[in-house]
């Protein structure tokens, strides 16, 4: 045997690929079985059929296959189907063939085994069923018929007369009792049969001894020349007497004549390598001649019966009979109610005989006895008796290489679970304990899979005993345990090997056992280290930590350390801090690191996700134990660096921190305990206990003070700090801040959310020790917006209030670390907000100084009031006090800190007192806080209270500052008293207080007075002028001293008169005003393809638009015409960037190669260069000579002219994997930002900074045009200091761009253009932000998802690409995007609002304004008719009318929105006039015009004047209604006739000038006629009747409009069912506008009447002019409402010529 053992990879299968000879033999057996079953199927229904011969032959074949199966040494404890464990074995395939024949199996159980009066048939049936036991399901086979199991009890008990049938019944009952339901059901039968079985074993043992005496001792030296049919052994058999008295012997078949497999194959079995050990030959005396067989080729044939064994079922041998009884007893052994029968039957004595292989002479008999012993060892009483009677030495006598060793190690595994038994074992002699550990370790390496698993589980429990643990290390146990898992095929990175479900299952069982054992191993060593620390340091650890109360003394070697598991986490923390602080080693953890266990445990976590068909509980337990073991290894700081190393798992590389963070974030199917375990590993790497942190900071400061400038060697504590900074940095690189913040905010799972939140907060506290992390956290909403305080209000789960209290404690500590000061919680009731905490800190750290003379003046005044004039006069003369307040006098001393009293020693603290230890200090703070619910005071003296930057937690202490123990100062100051005085008993009311010092002096009282006064300031500051006792203190208010007016017009006029800083403020205010106003100007959707990208040309005259098909179009901004296009790519364009001089242009596409290209602009686009793999290319900012391209995580800089690669910047493993990574130059082209990394263009080897990723979905970063900031998602960083300046949640997932000055930023959340679905729930918008403080200016609400946004270079217009609902027809789908051009700096008018509402209500985009201008005939036909026009009017106006009373007056007409009504009407009027001109220009013949108005006039009325003018046809229904209203009001309400009504001045008021008529597209001649006719008649009317007529007209008109609306709504609802709410909103607006308009007409009519009564009759032209002026004043009053459709006076003028005719 070689000195170095080779451990082949294991797939947990014990049988390799069988040879051709074995395969041929297996095939013959299966064919023979198939023939016999066919013969049975053909004859079993005949009355003369005798099943016994067929049963015998099938049984013989099965027994032969079983012997072949046994010779291959399968796992004896693996009770799975042979076909599952060994798919190529003959036994498994034969069993499958038999079980498929349901008729045969039914006959076998029902007819043959239970046959009456046919013992031979019962025997052969039971024999066959016993041979089928390895593949049977006991729940199914033994469930029916009901009398099956009772018949077996009858045969097996004392009533049975046939021994063979009795033995077979025992074997079948053993299989039946594997089902616990049967065991409980037949409890009484078992109580009778167990004693009988034990007595039967005594009898059979005696018979076996007699048979052995007859045979004599076997001499192995004679076995060379012998060849027996039993493969080298003689087994005593029982003569079975049949019914006819003849003796039945075993019949030989053709199968038995085949030669056994060649021994060379068997010699390659793993157990053969250990057969050469001399210790084994010396163990068993009968094996003394084994060494003579070393050179024999037949060695395995000789040794097989003694190491593996075999069995003879028919004729039933004595050994097999005893085995069946032992198997039955093993099935009953674990039941407590049968333990009494076991003791009464003296089972222990029987077992001692059977486990001695020298006595049993059968290894399988010994193995079955060990199985019975294992079932009895679950009882503590039996286990104690077994060990006390020498059971351990008896077990160790079983040869390791034999089959029975599996049973031995299983017994030891059961013993390990009993503490009392293990204590006895550990107190045995060293030889026995040593041999036990060696025996189990040998089985761990060389046994079957079940034996290895039992050995592993023995150590998982036994390693808590120091006696076992010490020997486990001594005999190289960790390495052997590592080999146990490392040799598994499952743990290899080999995807070519496919494992079966059975192999995966058994491999995962092995992995779980190893992880559990290693966890116990390191836990025990940590407990031992804690005990050693307690011996060495007592109760005072150098780190300031305390020992758990449970760990008080040294645990003996024979006692278990398992009770320490309750304080395991505290012990781990102590060991971690001590190893970090002292720099000592952890040898056991270091050895595991050398073995590669860090990678192995991480592999368990990573690879377990791909292991299918294993239970979630098994996967969780396995991974939790692996990560908990890993966490214990991280107690040694040097091992923590292993998490930085990249490891390969299934062709993917991961570092440890990534694995742990992803696990802690968790998936929906992962257990919370697994997330907690992963989070605990991260916490171990980044967290430092507060006590240890203080000690480290003190040592660092002292070492820096002692170190000389010449000494360059780092101190031990500097190395500690460097290691911590490295860990903090690595966690940040793997998105640690984002992950921890998300875990703190998580609320699922409900039961464990509080625990996860607590651990995450503790981990974030450790990470916040890093100053950059602290600065980032201070800007995040968790801290800045009091998110953490909100979480502290109540627990997630109401049953976890104790855990929530621990979380609140951790949260307070986190706030203290971030703020750098003590945070008190007002007796735990309410944690202060960040603003209040900062305010309090300012007040506490304000240096209080006051005038000493003023204090003496107050004392002087008090003496005068107390009638002590002489004392007051003496004080005034001695102190030279002025007559006025000293603060108003000069040359008065200022007291910067309290002065000591000359008469009392207690007013000054003795600095020679020793400073309190940190723990004593905390107890002092806790006591004061408990008595006084206030927030801080100095513990040392009033002088120390003025030192502002000294806190209790030296989180941010620098090495140059001395150590100060202070608190924050809101509670009254308490003098620092020596430890001896602290023990004094408090005074009682009756005791004298002359010997005690007062708590405060006068200076402290005055200081507190001033500090309380300072706390009332609105904006307190730390640096204040001297306080005065006579005048109220007040900090200066924040003032914005500027004379800039708010009015933008006045501000523009005064621009030249402003001061420089006022001009800056004015410019800032102007930009805020301009970029907070936007107005829709034009909408374009003239192309069939979708728009994907847009940008303005250099001169802002054209819009360069990219389409989905890869075309680039040049659209004129003013006209909206497409002036040219070029096909640039084969897929959607994702980026278009023209150069600054307009000579070149870069384009990028989605997926077609080349992805990007450079174009030269001229008369046509000319492609210059292509960039095949770069998904985005951009020009440099200061020059056109360089281009940066992005290919995944690589940024490449090209030369523009030559297209040569200048530099390449690869982010690699440090990249943050942005969702859209587009590299870009900084404004000065000195920096490049790519995938979260900032590069210096002069140094491409390493990035200068890696930004933290704080959001799961992050777009590319954008440099600020000023060159000092960069915007990454919702964070704004200063690229000079890399500090986070702002956190703007509104910028999350937004694409940002800047205006020309860089002072304004646009942001919008873009939608993926490749997504074909239109989500109506997505309503996108863009916002504008001011880049000074990134406050939002305005939000331009959009009703559709935004794909892209761009702004012109002159900041006049913007272009937004919106995704609209696609319109489908029979043959095509219209464009699903549109271009919306927005004007900057202009308010949105009502027409824009109506357009948006109209677009939402209709589904057909052909009705839009730009489509109508195209002159499509279909559009003319659709909109030309009266019915369609009338429908459009009411749809636009929201269906005029209101369900409320139309006659109700409007209280405040100034609040009405007049523009909606006017613009909606004028827009329709203009469109109809435009169509009229188009029809007139297209043809001279009116009859040939398409879309005639007459054909579409639904009301049947001809157009007025017969001209077919559509300007008024659209309101025909409203005209008729208004006419009826006029007549009804005149005749009924006012009592006048119709003629007067037609010629009334209020109706024909001349308030519409020629411009308004031209606005409605009337001919000038018609307008002039209308005006002249309107001036002919002006009858006078009283004022009151006119106002009454107006009120009546409003009421009747409102009712009529409602009726008209209700009549039309039914037809419109079918087209506009989704827009009813918008229509109702417009109803109210339209009604209010109508009322206002009618009242304006009444006021105009009244003014005209009064003018005529005054006698002022001028000419028609002058009257027209004056009337026009009047109307202009009225127009201002009613907000320019000039709607023709609702102007009854104007309609009267147009109809009057027809009436007169």
Curated annotation (Swiss-Prot):
Residues 1567-1581 have a biased composition (Basic and acidic residues). Residues 1468-1479 have a biased composition (Basic residues). Its main location: nucleus. GO terms for cellular component: Cul4-RING E3 ubiquitin ligase complex; nucleus. The keyword Repeat applies. Residues 224-245, 888-906 have a biased composition (Polar residues). InterPro entries: ARM-like, ARM-type_fold, LisH, VPRBP/DCAF1, WD40/YVTN_repeat-like_dom_sf, WD40_repeat_dom_sf. Belongs to the VPRBP/DCAF1 family. The DWD boxes are required for interaction with ddb1. Component of the cul4-rbx1-ddb1-dcaf1 E3 ubiquitin-protein ligase complex. This is DDB1- and CUL4-associated factor homolog 1.
């Amino acid at each position: 045997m070689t000195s170095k053992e080779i451990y082949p990879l294991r797939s947990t299968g014990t049988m390799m690929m069988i040879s051709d000879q074995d395969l041929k033999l297996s095939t013959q057996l299966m064919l023979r079985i198939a023939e016999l079953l066919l013969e049975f199927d053909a004859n079993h229904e005949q009355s003369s059929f005798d099943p016994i011969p067929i049963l015998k032959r099938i049984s013989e074949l099965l027994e032969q296959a079983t012997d072949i199966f046994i010779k291959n040494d399968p796992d004896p404890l693996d009770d799975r189907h042979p076909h599952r464990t060994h798919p190529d074995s003959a036994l498994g395939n034969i069993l499958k063939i038999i079980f498929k024949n349901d008729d045969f199996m039914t006959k076998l159980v029902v007819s043959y085994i239970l046959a009456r009066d046919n013992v031979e048939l019962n025997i052969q049936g039971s024999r066959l069923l016993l041979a089928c036991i390895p593949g049977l399901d006991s729940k199914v086979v033994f469930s029916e018929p009901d009398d099956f199991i009772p018949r077996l009890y009858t045969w097996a008990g004392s009533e049975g007369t046939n021994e063979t049938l009795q033995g077979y019944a025992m074997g079948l009952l053993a299989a039946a009792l594997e089902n616990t339901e049967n065991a409980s059901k037949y409890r009484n039968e078992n109580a009778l049969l167990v004693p009988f079985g034990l007595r039967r074993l005594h009898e059979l043992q005696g018979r076996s001894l007699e048979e052995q005496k007859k045979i004599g001792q076997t001499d192995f030296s004679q076995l060379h020349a012998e060849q027996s049919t039993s493969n080298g052994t003689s087994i005593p058999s029982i003569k079975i007497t049949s019914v006819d008295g003849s003796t039945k012997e075993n019949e030989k078949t053709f199968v038995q004549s085949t030669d056994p497999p060649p021994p060379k194959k068997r010699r390659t079995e793993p157990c053969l390598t250990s057969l050469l050990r001399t210790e084994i030959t010396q163990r068993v005396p009968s094996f003394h001649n084994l060494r003579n067989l070393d050179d024999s080729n037949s060695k395995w044939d000789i040794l097989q019966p003694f190491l593996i064994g075999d069995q003879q079922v028919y004729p039933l041998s004595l050994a097999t009979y005893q085995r069946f009884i032992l198997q039955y007893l093993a099935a009953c052994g674990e039941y407590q109610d049968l333990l009494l029968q076991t003791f009464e039957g003296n089972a222990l004595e029987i077992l001692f005989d059977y486990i001695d292989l020298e006595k049993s002479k059968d290894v399988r008999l010994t193995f079955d006895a060990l199985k019975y012993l294992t079932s009895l060892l679950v009882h503590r009483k039996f286990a104690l008796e077994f060990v006390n009677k020498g059971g351990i030495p008896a077990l160790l006598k079983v040869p390791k290489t034999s089959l029975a060793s599996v049973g031995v190690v299983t017994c030891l595994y059961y013993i390990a679970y009993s503490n009392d038994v293990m204590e006895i074992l550990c107190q045995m002699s060293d030889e026995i304990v040593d041999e036990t550990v060696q025996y189990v370790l040998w089985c761990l390496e060389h046994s079957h899979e079940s034996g290895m698993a039992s050995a592993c589980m023995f150590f998982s429990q036994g390693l808590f005993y120091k006696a076992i643990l010490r020997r486990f290390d001594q005999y190289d146990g960790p390495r052997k345990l590592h080999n146990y898992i490392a040799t598994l095929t499952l743990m290899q990175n080999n995807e070519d090997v496919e494992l079966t479900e059975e192999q995966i299952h058994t491999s995962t069982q092995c992995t779980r056992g190893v992880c559990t054992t290693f966890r116990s191993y390191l836990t025990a060593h940590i407990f031992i280290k804690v005990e050693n620390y307690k011996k060495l340091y007592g109760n005072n650890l150098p780190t300031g930590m305390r020992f758990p109360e449970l760990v008080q003394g040294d645990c003996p070697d024979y006692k278990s350390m398992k009770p320490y598991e309750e304080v395991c986490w505290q012990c781990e923390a102590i060991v971690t801090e001590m190893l970090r602080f002292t720099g000592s080693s952890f040898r056991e953890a270091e050895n595991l690191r050398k073995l590669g266990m860090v990678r192995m445990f991480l592999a368990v976590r990573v690879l377990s996700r791909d292991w299918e068909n294993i239970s979630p509980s098994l996967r969780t337990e396995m991974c939790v134990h692996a990560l908990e073991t890993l966490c214990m290894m991280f107690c040694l700081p040097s091992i923590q660096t292993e998490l930085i190393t990249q490891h390969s798992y299934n062709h993917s590389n991961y570092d440890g921190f990534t694995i742990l963070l992803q696990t802690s974030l968790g998936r929906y199917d992962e257990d919370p305990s697994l997330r907690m375990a992963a989070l605990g590993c991260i916490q171990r790497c980044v967290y430092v206990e507060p006590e240890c942190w203080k000690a480290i900071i003190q040592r660092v400061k002292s070492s820096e003070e002692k170190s000389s400038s010449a000494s360059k060697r780092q101190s031990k504590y500097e190395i500690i700090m460097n290691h911590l900074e490295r860990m903090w940095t690595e966690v940040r690189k793997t998105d640690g801040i984002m992950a921890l913040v998300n875990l703190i905010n998580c609320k699922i799972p409900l039961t464990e959310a509080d625990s996860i939140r607590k651990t995450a907060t503790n981990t974030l506290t450790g990470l916040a020790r890093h100053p950059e992390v602290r600065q980032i956290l201070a800007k995040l909403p968790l801290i800045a917006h009091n998110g953490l305080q909100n979480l502290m209000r109540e627990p997630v789960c109401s049953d976890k209030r104790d855990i929530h209290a621990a979380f609140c404690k951790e949260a307070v500590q986190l706030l203290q670390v971030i703020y750098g000061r003590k945070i008190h919680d007002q007796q735990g009731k309410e944690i202060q907000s960040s603003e209040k905490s900062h305010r309090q800190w300012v007040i506490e750290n304000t240096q209080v100084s006051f005038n000493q003379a003023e204090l003496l003046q107050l004392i002087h005044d008090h003496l005068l009031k107390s009638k002590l004039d002489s004392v007051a006069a003496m004080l005034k003369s001695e102190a030279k006090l002025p007559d006025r307040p000293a603060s108003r006098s000069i040359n008065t001393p200022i007291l910067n800190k309290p002065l000591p009293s000359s008469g009392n020693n207690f007013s000054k603290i003795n600095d020679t007192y020793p400073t309190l230890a940190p723990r004593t200090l905390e107890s002092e703070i806790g006591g004061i806080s408990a008595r006084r619910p206030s927030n801080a005071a100095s513990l040392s003296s009033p002088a120390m209270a003025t030192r502002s930057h000294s806190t209790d937690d030296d989180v941010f202490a620098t090495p140059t500052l001395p150590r100060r123990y202070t608190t924050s100062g809101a509670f009254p100051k308490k003098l620092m008293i020596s430890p001896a005085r602290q023990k004094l008993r408090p005074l009682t009311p009756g005791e004298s207080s002359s010997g005690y010092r007062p708590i405060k002096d006068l200076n402290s009282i005055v200081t507190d007075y001033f500090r309380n006064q300072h706390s009332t300031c609105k904006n307190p500051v730390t640096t204040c002028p001297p306080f005065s006792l006579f005048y109220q203190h007040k900090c200066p208010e924040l003032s914005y001293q500027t004379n800039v007016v708010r009015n933008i017009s006045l501000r523009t006029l005064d621009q030249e008169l402003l001061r420089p800083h006022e001009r800056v403020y004015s410019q800032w205010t102007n930009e805020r005003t301009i970029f907070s106003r936007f107005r829709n100007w034009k909408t374009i959707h003239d192309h069939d393809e979708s728009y994907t990208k847009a940008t303005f040309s250099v001169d802002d005259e054209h819009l360069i638009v990219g389409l989905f098909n890869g075309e680039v179009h040049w659209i004129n901004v003013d006209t909206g015409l497409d002036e040219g296009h070029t096909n640039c790519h084969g897929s959607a364009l994702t980026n278009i960037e023209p150069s600054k001089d307009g000579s070149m242009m870069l384009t990028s596409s989605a997926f077609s190669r080349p992805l990007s290209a450079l174009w030269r602009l001229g008369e046509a686009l000319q492609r210059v260069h292509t960039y095949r793999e770069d998904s985005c290319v951009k020009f440099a900012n200061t020059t056109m000579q360089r281009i940066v391209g992005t290919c995944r995580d690589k940024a490449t800089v090209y030369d523009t002219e030559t297209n040569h690669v200048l530099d390449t910047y690869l982010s690699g493993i440090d990249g943050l994997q942005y969702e859209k990574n587009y590299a870009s130059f900084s404004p000065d082209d000195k920096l490049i930002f790519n995938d979260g990394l900032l590069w210096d263009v002069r140094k491409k080897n390493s990035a200068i900074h890696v930004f933290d990723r704080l959001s799961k979905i992050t777009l590319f970063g954008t440099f600020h045009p000023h060159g000092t900031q960069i915007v990454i998602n919702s964070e704004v960083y200063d690229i000079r200091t890399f500090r986070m300046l702002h956190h703007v949640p509104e910028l999350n997932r937004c694409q940002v761009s800047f205006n020309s000055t860089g002072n304004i930023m646009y942001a919008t959340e873009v939608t993926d253009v490749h997504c074909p679905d239109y989500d109506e729930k997505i309503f996108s918008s863009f916002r504008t932000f001011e880049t000074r403080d990134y406050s939002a200016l305005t939000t331009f609400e959009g009703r559709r998802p935004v794909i892209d946004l761009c702004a012109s270079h002159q900041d006049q217009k913007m272009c937004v690409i919106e995704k609209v609902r696609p319109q489908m027809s029979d043959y095509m789908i219209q464009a699903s995007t549109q271009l919306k051009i927005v004007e900057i700096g202009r308010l949105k008018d009502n027409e824009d609002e109506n357009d948006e509402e109209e677009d939402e209500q209709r589904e057909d985009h052909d009705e839009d304004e730009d489509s109508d201008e195209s002159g499509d005939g279909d559009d003319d036909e659709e909109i030309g008719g009266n019915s369609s026009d009338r429908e459009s009017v009411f749809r636009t106006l929201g269906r005029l009318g209101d369900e409320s009373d139309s006659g109700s007056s409007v209280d405040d007409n100034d609040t009405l929105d007049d523009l909606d009504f006017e613009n909606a009407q004028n827009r329709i009027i203009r469109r109809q006039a435009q169509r009229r001109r188009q029809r007139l220009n297209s043809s001279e013949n009116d009859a040939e015009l398409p879309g005639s108005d007459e054909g579409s006039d639904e009301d049947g009325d001809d157009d007025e004047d017969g001209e077919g003018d559509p300007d008024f046809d659209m309101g025909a229904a409203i005209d008729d209604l208004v006419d009826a209203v006029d007549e009804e009001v005149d005749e009924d309400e006012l009592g006048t006739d119709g003629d007067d009504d037609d010629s009334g001045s209020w109706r024909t008021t001349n308030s519409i000038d020629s411009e308004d008529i031209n606005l409605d597209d009337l001919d000038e001649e018609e307008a002039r006629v209308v005006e002249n006719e309107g001036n002919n008649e002006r009858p006078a009317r009283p004022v009151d009747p006119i106002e009454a007529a107006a009120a009546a007209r409003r009421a009747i008109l409102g009712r009529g409009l409602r009726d008209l609306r209700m009549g039309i709504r039914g037809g419109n609802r079918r087209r506009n069912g989704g827009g009813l709410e918008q229509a109702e909103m417009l109803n109210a607006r339209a009604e209010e506008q109508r009322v206002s308009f009618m009242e304006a007409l009444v006021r105009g009519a009244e003014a005209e009447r009064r003018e005529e009564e005054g006698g002022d009759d001028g000419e028609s032209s002058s009257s027209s002019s004056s009337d026009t002026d009047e109307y202009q004043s009225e127009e201002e009053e009613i907000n320019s409402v000039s709607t023709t459709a609702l102007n009854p006076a104007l309609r009267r003028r147009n109809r009057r010529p027809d009436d007169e005719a």
